[in-house]
């Protein structure tokens, strides 16, 4: 009572783990002819002394990645995205997660043929763009786009760009790597914003709060292609409860202390000791083995809203689909995204420009241009030490069955530390799929929606059959009546021959054609024509009265 506590932010406003899409969920889960298969490789450029107890594959440099992925390329996979777990920044102190990378590979399959598509194989190539020192960030982008377009003119397909700052070198020649947090104050600086002492519960998703479509995200894939060492079993992400976070006790942090230079003191004095910083830019391309076409790439600048607490980034937000949907509808494919925080203001809220690189529609394919639908996922990746416990791979595998292709993963410099020592970082995942064919709808009457199209067609068919059967029945009766009239007229015309009269039973009528005359066997009918015939031939009447001749009797 009497305590003036700050109001907690609404979870709907700052709740991570959100999914944004141009479609509704039933349309997102509509199966198409194409499916995808994903696998990934986690690797690091740090040595075992710098990063002990890690299952990540160790590479001497990013230049060794094409050789490392050669076996997967021979199996039909190709690189789809490449990113560090944490976005590198211009800070002098570097953290371990900036030097741990993930490469996601994809293989396309055809659902209808139940066979893999091998129409276009690739080889992975790397281009070392530049090693820049004290160059403004906004000047890097035009130079990089020019490099990408030059490679595209040679038939290469751009995949990803990885900017990497070289680690700081001390006077003893060893690299100094800053842990995520080495004190209670550092942990609070990472997780608390100015004037807000709320817990990580407001910024870290729980399984019960996220959308149903992200329910599978909090599961770790069982296999890790290309990884070395034993991977510890997956556990719960370790996201603390509100009571645990609000306790005023100490934060026992573990798992991310560097192995070297632990006695050099607080690394926050780095800017004075090491004013010189270099950044290396590596660009990765897929070269098609068979057909090579010239691709066009263009940049799109999107404003990103950054919240900072001192030099620590606490949040990063943007209206993703608002700025990208128009490019998706016109057939643009997102390939990669880069941004630097040097353009952001030093105030609490600042804006920085994110540069998103799109592949334009080829001029050769203008006649078959089709738009794309998109999904954007704001995903929190949780790590225990350096081992991933929660990430986007389960969600990616579930969407692969519906033909969604991963195009880009944008890491952020956001880091939050929990009481258990786990670290969570925010990553933005982009997926695309060709638009579903639009069904043409006919204008129907007001109440036609009660019946399906098949039921309406069946009712119309039965109705037409009923009308047809009634008309056929009437026509058959008329034909039968006309036929009886024709028989009656044919029996009254011609010569009549009487055999032995048998009046006690019905006579048998047979029609026999001899030339053009009609002969009727049996008793002739009593009509006016037959009477007129008897009176007009008296000789025939006399013969009939005399009876049959002997010759006829025989």
Curated annotation (Swiss-Prot):
According to Swiss-Prot or TrEMBL, what is its membrane topology? Lipid-anchor
Q: Where in the cell is it found?
A: Cell membrane; Cytoplasm; Membrane raft; Endosome
Q: List compositional bias (Basic and acidic residues) regions by residue number.
A: 198-209, 475-487, 526-542
* Residues carrying lipid (N-myristoyl glycine): 2
Q: Where is this region: Disordered?
A: 192-249, 441-488, 504-554
Q: Which domain of life is it from?
A: Eukaryota
Cite the record's note on assembly.
Interacts with TLR4; the interaction occurs in response to lipopolysaccharide stimulation. Interacts with CLTC; the interaction occurs in response to pathogens. Interacts with AP2A1 and AP2B1.
- According to UniProt, the name of this protein is Raftlin
Tell me the organism: Mus musculus
